[in-house]
Swiss-Prot record:
Region (Disordered): 131-160
Location(s), subcellular: Cytoplasm; Cell projection, Cilium
Protein name: Protein broad-minded
Keywords recorded for this protein, A-Z: Cell projection, Cilium, Cytoplasm, Developmental protein
Listed GO CC annotations: cilium; cytoplasm
Length: 1257
């Protein structure tokens, strides 16, 4: 290492010279040599660019190469010492490694080498300085003897070292260079002067008084016929751009721009015409392009630093550029004789107008650019639009088989040295397209429109320009089928326009103003119209163009405003019958899937075209409102049919034989088929994004394959595209809302994987948890590192799914659990974590030390035991937020952190029992009398119903508490009786029931029903609504109800457990009616018998339609109740429209509103609302219609909005909604809000609710 080469010395010398040039201002301003040395020693602390200097980088690399491995070894030693018990902090480790390194032999050798080479480099620099100084003095004496004294004057201090003096550039030297650059000087003198100028520090050159004169002379010299001299001046300009401050580079830039402007305006320079084209091997063209490229390179770099300088510098650069780009010659009337303007050459070196993109990125420069475009240089925008118009007209008039100007971009991969006129026109078109696309992103840019074009009547509006862009996609020629290299497609017209429109669609405000317009949508859909009529889409339209159109439509459909436009058009209330964009896209997609369009039959690109348009449909049908529009097209059936066909093809692909020529072709074919199969599964899967769509998915019979597809992506940790509405986690949650979905998740291995992951996090902790800080004492019932896995499992545990997963299974209850035994199913998790009914289970969960302290205390108060006590009390008590007292879930900060008694055995401590008192009876009220009077008058059925409903609403708003007790019983009985007497109000036919008590005496209820009876009676007695003997009476009612409903059920063979026998849960609606009727079993059953004829019974009384003969067979076989695919479907649709923040919160949490609403409705809001509110919920739906079930749920979400947003942030929304009561919610408080919802949505909701018996689409 002691020896070093001359190349190393030269390299270090150049690095060191550049370092001193960069810090010269700092060290020359020092009062003494010692201060200068001090500045250099502390340069790292004072210079923010210290680590960017080449010399510093060289030293860092040299140290790393020499000492890097040794430092790593020392670090490993220290780490191993720490693991063995020697605790030491990070700073201590650094000190130890530093000390050992400095004491090493390698470090000493490295320092010796650096010292020797730096001494040699400095001495060489000093010697070179002395030689250069002597040579300069001699030259000065020969040329200007009269000024020799001033040239030799040295203004530096005697105390300065020769190293500092070597970078002193005096005024006299610059004046000498100015004189030597004069065109009359000999070539050698001019070359030498320019060489001296290039090697001088830029800051010294700038500080000289003659800098402006020098800049002007350099600009003039750019026209020098000598190419070598011209190139050296360009080299100086490039060096100035690279190393100088902005105010210096600004002078060079504006000078170069003005030079180019004068160059193009001068008649003496030979600028080619459009017909002649550009030969870049021509020396004149080469030099011109070099100058343009240099200017363009600085254009792209300037925005990164000009914000740190005064605005006037940036304005001068922008204005000089725009002035140059708007230069126009006196053009000939013949286009081919047109002299090329500067913009053509800028388009050659920067085809995609990257410079304009960078200038428009920051508000600082964008404001100036747009102001100047509006006031002085609008012609730049005008000519860009004109170029796009000309290219479009050329595409329309040119024959399809003619080779167009962009052919070389698409087909010829070799270097192009000559550009034809058509190619120049195309390159300028691409530049104009990118410039306009960037301009339209910004509001002030769009304000430049409309624009007047030459030789064109009228003004070009913003929409006109977007229509032009859109038409270019299918009128312009395209490259060969997308099988060529990726870069070949980058500059095709359709790809470029599509890229611009994609960018516009990503900016919401811009998209609304530019793309979300009926005219633009109709233009996009025009080729589809033509194809569906049997015509060609356009003279040049291809599969590639259709794929681009579909890509743009998909972007539009992925945004709410664009989706509404596609669904309903610009005027949602319009009476026009013309189909909207969504209908046209769906019709075309269905024809493609059914192969009902012959024009592309046999095309290799046909599957890609199909996939692109189905993707648009997927964005639409993955929303509730979109599915309502597209449901009539039965796209799920067409996609399923195509998937089954593709699946059969994939099975028939022969296994490639090694060595066979067909291996690659077979492999490619199989990959294409498998990719198409996955796409179709993904399309089917997205029907699960809505409750009704999930029903359609289950009807296709492909739900198992779709769930397996999700699991494969989950296992591979694949990301979802940002333009997809749903992540797969949300879809999994929705699938788990049904019994068939739960089974599919189990078969795929999804549930097994989630349970294993949860157990791993609970038992072993996460691998990526930082260990540098000790874990705090646990105060939460669940560790944050486990919460994500826990919530993922909670999302899947809906009642229908969990019933399928655990029914008919016993707890293992093993005598011993080994450490390696990992739960793999839901019943295992219940056995190991929830029902800890044996010592073996308890000890398997705790460490040896923890399990030995159990006998020392009755209870250990911590976050987990507090949570357990809360859960046990909650399970034992039934009631709403005011009807039960639940212990807190957090410890208090006091001497007695948890004053609540632990509930470990019966009876429940009295402190948890509420002292709520109920009125024995409510005095008669005038409004109630009016309502009861209405029930007796029924001359005109419609008016009578409306009067009753109006009076009921009035009472609910003013005196809601009156509607309870005996009054509520009388209201319900009389209103339902009157409704059933009118055939028009009866949805279901009358069913005669003749079973006696003896017939049902020997029938048994399920254990779930029996448990529900006990809870109901306990709750009824607590509210003083039920008396002794109520348990037998409720049992009687439930048995007769099951017998009554069994008469209306159909026989079905299904593997789903929930469809094998009676309703799979407790009948909470019957229990509620039994309590409303104050335990009168006869009244209860009579009311239910009458009520079962009304449409409302289908949605309030869930067992009413269990395997019902009134539902289509495919609906019954799915096991999905109308409450899910109808009520909760509309709840989600209204939630998105009325409470978008809440809807987004659910989406972010990966939890579905439909799942929690199904839980609320299934148990009639028990444990969520107080009894009086449950009565009002039932009465409201009976009096006002089943659609009020939807409105009440929306009102609940409105009431909970702030809580939902808060718990979304804390990532426990699922737990909050499932466990917390609806504190403060009263049905009567939201009646006016629900009436508004009724006005807006009742027609649609009731129509769909009445169609459940015909729901076969």
């Amino acid at each position: 290492m002691a020896h070093f080469s001359s190349e190393d010395q030269a390299m270090l010398q150049a690095m060191l010279r550049r370092l001193f040039q960069s810090v010269k201002e700092k060290i020359t301003g020092a009062p003494s040599l010692e201060c200068a040395e001090e500045i250099l020693l502390h340069l790292e602390e004072t210079d923010e660019n210290f680590h960017n200097y080449e010399f510093v980088k060289y030293l860092r690399q040299h140290i790393g190469n020499t000492l890097g491995s040794m430092i790593e070894e020392e670090m490993e030693k220290c780490t191993s010492d720490r693991n063995q018990g020697e605790e030491c902090g990070y700073d201590t480790v650094v000190q130890q490694v530093t000390k050992r390194t400095q004491e090493s032999k390698e470090y000493k050798e490295m320092m010796h080498y650096l010292k020797n080479i730096m001494i040699a480099v400095v001495e060489s620099m000093i010697n070179k300085f002395e030689e250069d100084e002597t040579r300069n003095q001699e030259r000065q004496k020969k040329i200007q003897k009269e000024k020799s004294h001033s040239y030799r004057t040295d203004n530096c201090s005697d105390s300065d070292s020769s190293l500092n003096q070597s970078y002193k550039f005096c005024q006299g030297k610059l004046q000498l260079i100015l004189d030597q650059l004069d065109p009359g000087q000999p070539k050698e003198v001019r070359y030498e002067a320019l060489q001296t100028l290039c090697s001088a520090p830029p800051s010294d050159v700038l500080n000289c008084e003659n800098w402006t004169t020098l800049c002007e002379k350099l600009t003039v010299s750019l026209s020098d016929p000598d190419p070598v001299f011209s190139d050296r001046i360009l080299k100086f300009c490039a060096q100035t751009f690279l190393l100088s401050p902005l105010h210096m580079t600004k002078e060079i830039y504006t000078s170069l721009a003005k030079y180019l402007e004068s160059y193009f305006l001068s008649r003496e320079n030979h600028i080619p015409t459009l017909s002649a084209g550009v030969d870049i091997t021509n020396p004149n063209m080469t030099r011109l392009l070099k100058k343009v490229r240099l200017l363009n390179e600085y254009q792209k770099e300037a925005p990164s630093f000009w914000i740190r300088h005064p605005e006037k510098y940036m304005e001068e650069i922008v204005e000089s550029t725009l002035s140059l780009l708007t230069v126009k010659h006196n053009q000939s009337h013949v286009v081919s004789q047109k002299i090329l303007d500067p913009i053509y050459f800028f388009a050659l070196v920067d085809t995609k107008a990257v410079w304009f993109k960078k200038w428009m990125h920051a508000h600082y420069s964008r404001t100036t650019v747009l102001r100047l475009l509006e006031t002085k240089y609008k012609s730049l925008v005008t000519t860009a639009i004109q170029q796009c118009v000309q290219y479009f007209e050329m595409c329309k008039t040119r024959k399809a088989d003619e080779t167009l100007g962009h052919s070389k971009h698409c087909r010829n991969k070799q270097k192009t040295f000559y550009y034809l006129g058509q190619e120049l026109q195309y390159i300028y078109f691409i530049h104009s397209l990118c410039l306009l696309g960037r301009l339209l992103i910004y509001k002030q840019g769009r304000k430049l429109f409309p624009i007047k074009l030459k030789n064109k009547k009228g003004l070009v509006s913003l929409i006109d320009l977007l229509v032009l862009f859109t038409q270019l996609i299918y009128y312009s020629p395209s490259c060969p089928k997308m099988t060529s290299a990726a870069h070949s497609e980058n500059y095709s017209p359709a790809s470029m326009v599509t890229e611009v429109l994609w960018i516009l669609s990503d900016q919401k405000e811009c998209a609304v103003e530019c793309l979300y317009n009926n005219i633009v949508i109709e233009t996009l859909l025009q080729p589809i119209h033509n194809l569906m009529k049997g015509n060609e889409a356009s003279p040049n339209c291809s599969e590639t163009a259709l794929i681009h159109i579909a890509g743009i439509l998909a972007r539009i459909a992925s945004v709410e405003e664009g989706l509404i436009l596609l669904l309903y058009g610009a005027n949602m209330n319009s009476s026009e019958e013309s189909p909207t964009g969504a209908h046209i896209i769906a019709q075309f997609s269905k024809k493609l899937l059914d192969e009902d369009i012959s024009i592309f039959s046999g095309s290799e690109m046909l599957p890609v075209v199909k996939g692109a348009f189905i993707s648009v449909c997927r964005h639409i049908y993955s929303t509730c409102e979109g599915l309502q529009v597209l449901i009539t097209y039965n796209l799920h059936e067409s996609i399923a049919k195509a998937w089954k066909k593709t699946s059969l093809l994939s099975e028939r692909i022969p296994t490639p034989v090694e060595g066979s020529d067909s291996v690659s072709s077979v492999s490619q074919e199989s990959q294409n088929i498998m990719a198409w199969e996955d796409n179709l599964l993904d399309d089917l899967l997205h029907f699960a994004a809505t409750p009704k769509g999930l029903l359609l998915l289950q009807r296709t019979g492909a739900i198992n394959e779709c769930v397996t597809f999700i699991f494969n992506r989950y296992a591979k940790k694949l990301q979802v595209s940002r333009h997809k509405k749903f992540g797969y986690g949300v879809l999994v949650t929705r699938v788990a809302s049904t019994a068939a979905g739960g089974i599919a998740l189990k078969k795929s291995g999804f549930i097994n994987e989630l349970i294993t992951e949860l157990w791993s996090n609970l038992e072993y902790g996460r691998d990526d948890v930082r260990v540098t800080h000790p874990r705090t004492t646990p105060v939460d019932p669940i560790d944050r590192s486990c919460q994500k896995s826990f919530l993922a499992l909670v999302n899947l545990l809906s009642y229908p799914a969990i019933y399928e997963l655990v029914r008919n299974q016993d707890l293992p209850n093993k005598t011993e659990y080994s450490l390696r035994e990992v739960p793999t199913c839901v019943i295992d998790i219940i056995d190991r974590l929830i029902i800890l009914n044996s010592e073996a289970k308890i000890r398997s969960l705790f460490n040896y030390e923890q399990s030995h302290i159990f006998g020392l205390r009755d209870f250990i108060i911590d976050g987990l035991s507090v949570e357990r006590n809360h859960v046990l009390v909650r399970i034992n008590l039934v009631g709403g937020p005011l009807e039960r007292i639940l212990p807190p879930r957090l410890l208090e900060k006091s001497d007695n952190p948890y004053p609540w008694p632990m509930f470990s055995s019966y009876p429940l401590p009295n402190c948890y029992l509420s002292d709520i008192t109920r009125n024995a009876g409510i005095k008669q009220d005038n409004d109630l009398d009016k309502l009861l009077l209405c029930l007796k008058i029924s001359d005109k059925q419609t008016e009578w119903i409306e009067n009753c409903q109006r009076q009921f609403c009035k009472m609910m708003k003013a005196k809601p508490d009156i509607i309870s007790g005996e009054a509520l019983i009388e209201l319900l009985e009389k209103f339902v009786l009157h409704l059933t007497e009118s055939p028009s109000e009866c949805y279901f036919p009358s069913v005669e029931y003749t079973a006696t008590d003896a017939n049902v005496k020997n029938e048994s209820l399920s254990s779930v029903q029996q448990l529900g009876i006990k809870m109901t009676v306990r709750y009824g007695k607590f509210l003083s609504l039920l008396k002794d003997g109520a348990e037998n009476d409720l049992t009687w009612v439930l048995k007769h109800c099951e017998r009554f409903l069994k008469q209306q059920q159909t026989s079905i063979k299904s593997s789903l457990l929930c469809l094998q026998g009676n309703y799979a849960g407790h009948d909470w609606f019957v229990s509620s009616l039994f309590m409303i009727m104050l335990g009168d079993k006869e009244k209860t059953f009579q009311f239910l018998h009458q009520f079962s004829r009304l449409l409302t019974s289908a949605f309030l009384w869930l067992p009413r339609l269990h395997i019902s003969s009134y539902l289509p067979n495919d609906t019954v076989e799915s096991g999905i109740h109308p409450v899910y695919f109808c009520s909760t479907h509309y709840i989600e649709m209204l939630l998105k429209a009325e409470l978008p923040l809440v809807f987004s919160a659910f989406h972010m949490s990966g939890f579905a509103p439909s799942q929690i609403c199904l839980q609320w409705i299934t148990q009639c809001f028990w444990n969520y609302l107080d009894w009086i509110e449950i009565c009002h919920y039932i009465a409201t739906c009976v009096f006002l219609g089943p659609d009020y079930q939807v409105y009440i749920c929306i009102a609940v979400f409105k009431h909970l909005q702030q809580d939902i947003l808060q718990h979304t942030q804390t990532q426990d929304l699922q737990v909050f909604l499932k466990e917390e009561a609806l504190h403060g919610f009263r049905v009567s408080d939201y009646f006016e809000y629900m009436e508004i919802l009724e006005q807006n949505y009742r027609t649609v909701l009731l129509r769909d609710m009445r169609n459940i018996r015909l729901q076969s689409t």
